[in-house]
């Protein structure tokens, strides 16, 4: 089974066939997997994720033990389920099974019966552009609104 990541979710929105075939590397081979630039971008994404965790301190990280040879999806979902029994909790990398899909969210904040899911994205910008965040009208540029909370 392959997890439904943000990248795969976006891929499915662009083209459901790509999502379907992404499980079969012989049929659909991603030539960008070994691209050093894309690997550096992914590393930047991890940094942004760590920064987001600082915004929600005291959380519990759901992770698979490093000594396992395979990823135990059910164990990760069970850890999340156990933590959600608490009245209030912050969970990093919360894991769920929904209709045979394995899903993770960057940050989950539970306060009583209210649950907030926070997904973090990294976005590059051109530092020479004078209106990256705020436009000439002194308002936030609309293309940045999905990235700000």
Predicted regions and their residues:
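A short acidic/basic microdomain associated with nuclease active sites
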Residues: 60-97
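Charged, glycine-rich intrinsically disordered N-terminal tails and low-complexity linkers that flank
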Residues: 1-60
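Context-gated lysine
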Residues: 2, 6, 10, 18, ...
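Generic alpha-helix structural propensity
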Residues: 4, 43, 47-51, 75, ...
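General "foldedness" signal
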Residues: 23-26, 33, 66, 106, ...
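Mg2+/Mn2+-dependent nuclease catalytic core
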Residues: 85-149
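A general structural signal for short secondary-structure junctions and capping/turn motifs
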Residues: 1-2, 10-12, 81-83, 97-99, ...
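Sequence-level detector for tyrosine residue identity
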Residues: 20, 28, 51, 56, ...
């Amino acid at each position: 089974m392959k997890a439904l990541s943000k990248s795969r979710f976006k891929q499915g929105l662009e083209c459901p066939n790509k999502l379907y075939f992404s499980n079969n590397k012989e049929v659909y081979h991603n030539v960008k997997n070994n691209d050093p630039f894309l690997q550096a971008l992914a590393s930047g994404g991890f940094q942004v994720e760590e920064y987001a965790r600082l915004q929600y301190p005291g959380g519990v990280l759901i992770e698979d033990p490093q000594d396992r040879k395979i990823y135990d999806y059910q164990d990760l979902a069970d850890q999340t389920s156990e933590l959600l029994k608490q009245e209030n909790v912050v969970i990093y990398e919360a894991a769920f099974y929904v209709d045979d899909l394995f899903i993770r969210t960057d940050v989950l904040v539970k306060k009583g019966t209210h649950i907030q899911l926070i997904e973090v994205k990294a976005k590059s910008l051109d530092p020479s552009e004078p209106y990256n965040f705020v436009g000439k009208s002194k308002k936030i540029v609309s293309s940045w609104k999905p990235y700000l909370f």
